[in-house]
Amino acid sequence: MRDKKLLRIALRYRAIYLDIDPKEIDLETKPTPAVLAFVARLRENGFSVNEDLLHALCMVSATELADITAVIDDVMGVKLNWATLVKGWNVPTGKTRADHLITFFANLIGGAKVGLEGCTLPCGCFIPEGTFPLERYTGCPFCGTPFTTANFVYKGQASKLKELRLFTEEDLKQVYQSLLASPTPLDATQKDSFEKLIDIYGLPDNVEISMKETAMLAVKHLVANGQQAQAQALLKTPTDILRYLWYEKTGYVQIIEPRTLIAQARRFYYHMFGPLNQSEYAGKEMKKKLKLKYDRKHCQCVASWINNLALSPQQATENMNAKRGMWVRMIRALRLGEYSRRKGYEHLADILDAFYRQEQPTWLGILQQARNNRDTQTVLQMLKQRPGLFARSLFATMLRFGCEETMEAFEQVTDQMPSRLLLSLGNAAEKYFDPDATRTVHPITGYTISIPKNKLLSLYSPADLRAMVARVKQCYILSLKHSFAAQATKARTIYIAPSLFDIPISVGDRSATIQDTSCALMGTRFPVEGDAVRLFLQWGKGLHAQPLDMDISCHIAFENGKTEDCAYYRLKATGAKHGGDIRAIPDMVGTAEYIELSLPELAEAGAKYVTFTANAYSCGALSPNLVVGWMNSAYPMKVSEKTGVAYDPSCVQHMVRISESNLSRGLVFGVLDVDEREITWLEMPFISQNIQGCDFTAVNALLQRLRNKLSIGQLLEIKAEAQHLSLAPSPDEADEAYTYEWALNPAEVSALLNM
């Protein structure tokens, strides 16, 4: 079990984990028949091996190779059901809305019971003669229930293989250390890897974890192993304690207030068809779920944590005020008032006394009063006391109090800020100071909203706004150069892979899906080979047979402003074909939907962009373990004439899995640029039962923001200039080599900003 967990983590970094000593690898060894057979199986799944891994495989037994094959098959979903509703769905069935309407009324009046000619299917639906061509379906064309499953997938149709490398115990420990030290919040893939690694390796002594959310995962591990006292070192403020308690209650490492979660539950379970709408019931159930109830052991643990905080009562109170309403509930539920009267809990008593008296003015209150009084000097002096808050309010402060004065004060404290914060300012400046741009935000509750521009922008001329953007960019580039120059290095040459110039730095773009076969950063561009892109959606793995309707769709935007959708309600669109709408899942093996895009047809029709989406039509969020992605090959990809299976793991270019903590009902997962023949991987959640509820203005805004962000390659060029490094033509000739494989670990990329 341990090795299987480590193998799954290694696959995310395009590697295979082997429990061997790399020093014992014999590079002269010839591959055994078992190794050659294993490599052939890897090719069927779209993978190849480099030379080091090939020789390393000779050191493991055939049984271990079989176990590795089983894990890779499971990750790629080879044993699941990939049949869809229509046989040979690349040829349209010719069904119409009239077929659905006639079938609806035929079932309404009794079907065969009243003498109508037709066929009654196992699901109970009556299909009148002359409507749906039943010989073309694997299930019911009216209610979407599948009757048959498939136990095969196509293999080996890929034109390009993904090379795997060797990972040993030392490599995985380095991954673990990079996650512990990550200066940016972990995305869903990193979080899943971290939880597995901390269970295997434990938490190192005297570890420093810079990210609060990562610290909560570590605290959870310590508490689960009865090490509550050791967890105290990671809980330095009352907010840290509240964050852990709320994570324990809800499963989210961010503090999401109860009213937000209740409103979110109502949105998730809203259904456009009234009888299926469960929004009110879901809201009541969420309210019950969030009720606080703790046993005595838990209460004493939290009381000790607060009592042992190194903060003064006034500092602790100010920290608690931001979530005062939640703290009032927690204090009552945890019986902290009772514990504060016990001997040894005097510090807890002082904190609660200061919290309830509210006698001391808060820092934020004083700052807001100075803002209201337009006291520029006081505002800037106070913001310099908290550089992080200064950075987050920099743009609004520039508009309100003037660019020059604000930037002069800001530049005095830039050396106290992490580079990732300055980088995010540089990436956001152009969009913020553009009066005509669409600004989008992605709340942690799983949807995307557009926000209005700052009204103060109208007070400045275009030249003034451009000057503000230039000043911000100049500030962060100079700061980055200064930070890189301050680093001691013995290197004289550097290699930067060309592909890194197409991958933006992931600061501010945290993925909520799990990537089991790679760790592509949001904004990564994938070139399209061949003339077809095949989208796929697989859901229902591990679930019993039940109605569960997930949908895959695409939105086609043409140069003339026209748009078309290819979805369950329109199976044939310009340059796109849908495999049929399934609304129920078979037992344990799931089911699948597909869309095939023809690039020649799209180009001929003048299509510019195609946006890929997945939605939960059923009440609730996207199903956990749902897998979505796309296939691509220079060679034609087959479609089964018997079951509609169109999945080939070797052709998968990118795929993601929905995590258990998913908070979205819809997901935009890619945009195809028809002219450039490339797909941009992005992740934009939204709340809607189908693609018609997606805000494509927000999608375009996100796409442009990703393309305008500083790329990894550009950041490395700044590093090379600051440290006077010359560019090397290959990794072997460089003192420092930054390859695509290195970029597969987002924590390593983020480490560049941890200065």
Question: Which residues fall in each region the model found?
Answer:
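Intrinsic-disorder/low-complexity signal
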Residues: 1-755
